[in-house]
Amino acid sequence: MKKIGIVGSGLVGSLQAILMAKKGYDVSVFENRPDLRKAKLLAGKSINLALSDRGLKALREAGIEEDIKAMSIPMYKRCMHAVDGTLSYQQYGKEDQAIYSVPRGGLNQKLMNLADKYPSIKYNFNRKCKDVELNTNTLIFENLETKEEEKHAFDSIFATDGAFSAVRFRMQKTPMFDYSQKYLDHGYKELVIPANEDGTHKLDKNCLHIWPRGEFMMIALANMDGSFTCTLFFPMFGEKSFDTINTKEKVSAFFNETFADTIPLMPTLLDDYMENPTSSLVMVRCSPWNYEDKILLLGDSAHATVPFYGQGMNCGFEDCTIFGEMLDAANGNWDGLLSAYSKERVPDGNAIIDLSLRNYVEMRDLTGNKEWLLRKKIESKFNDLHPDKWLPLYSQVTFSHIRYNKVVQNGVEQDAIMEQVMKLPNIEEKWDSQEVMDKMLSLV
């Protein structure tokens, strides 16, 4: 039986372990940290994730789609909070289409518990990856409990150890390996809207709440316990930034001016802001994602992105399903498979980073913009009439399995068409008229 080593027991690593075990492989998973199922889950690293169709497909293949949906909250639309407290809504897709707010820790635990049911999967915690012997495909770990060095050789290795992957660091020293990382000027901080005393939510739980403010924004996603996890995306430095808004007095003044409608909802705001960590946002691009037929990067180790399309986990899960499909198509023959996968998938990894950056501008600058909202209404109406001719960009990313790279190309074409449509005289009054729909039909 082929022996598989997986470095990293996070979401992608645990899912890949399950999918490989289902295909009959012997899998060993190594994790730097202790078993998170025995640790208290701490805030800091986003505890809500937006699960959408690409990720759901992978969970379906693992056999736990319904289990995960049962611990998540469907979000059917965005709710935009203006500075004056006015609310406006935008449907994500068709009436029944939703993205799901799912707790990172709970999802990770569920995947690990499912993996434990496979006798062919073994978890090894407190193992820090120090190096990889490429010629023998041997992983070298420090056992953090005994302080001893351990060596484990495998037929194939999957690196799912995140944006600062130790395995990728070794691959970076090989010839012709391209690598870049870039930090966003903005970071993020987690805050909380607690549940009402009776355990109900203070805001509509079936919306993703956004406070768009131009240079920055805050979002809130519902938790099963009635609370919301809020994330403030804010410049790291500058006049209004994490660097300068650094006392309780300044935080109070800033929120009263900028997010006034949240003040009554957030009784622990000042303590949360001062005590919770400020985290940075990093993007990683690299190529190739494989080393010979031995090692393959999956998830953030290959393509760490920023969270503004809610696609980090979904893209990582899609990595696993696409690899599985290619392995099946090759009838289990690994010769040249990792290289073929890398060539196929790298353009999509780059594309989701580009799409995520674009969506950040859209979320913080445009969701409050009347012209942008009108454009979205026109697109939605045309999509209702001609679903075979037009799928809005957001739906292509979130509710389809179209390759991310193709989505980028489609987006460029759609932008060019909508630019012409938005220039039509009196478009604000006649946006849903037959004339406008016919014009779009002539352009697609």
List where the protein language model places each region.
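C-terminal helical "tail/cap" subdomain of flavin- and related membrane-associated enzymes
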Residues: 325-444
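Conserved FAD-binding catalytic core of PHBH/FMO-like flavoproteins
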Residues: 113, 118, 127-131, 136-281, ...
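Acidic/histidine metal-binding catalytic segments
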Residues: 70-74, 122, 259-274, 331-340, ...
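Conserved N-terminal helical subregion
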Residues: 2, 21, 52-192, 442-443
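Conserved Rossmann-like nucleotide-cofactor binding loop
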Residues: 12, 35, 164
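Glycine-rich FAD pyrophosphate-binding loop
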Residues: 21-43
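Conserved mid-domain beta->alpha element of the FAD-binding
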Residues: 9-22, 158, 191, 277-368
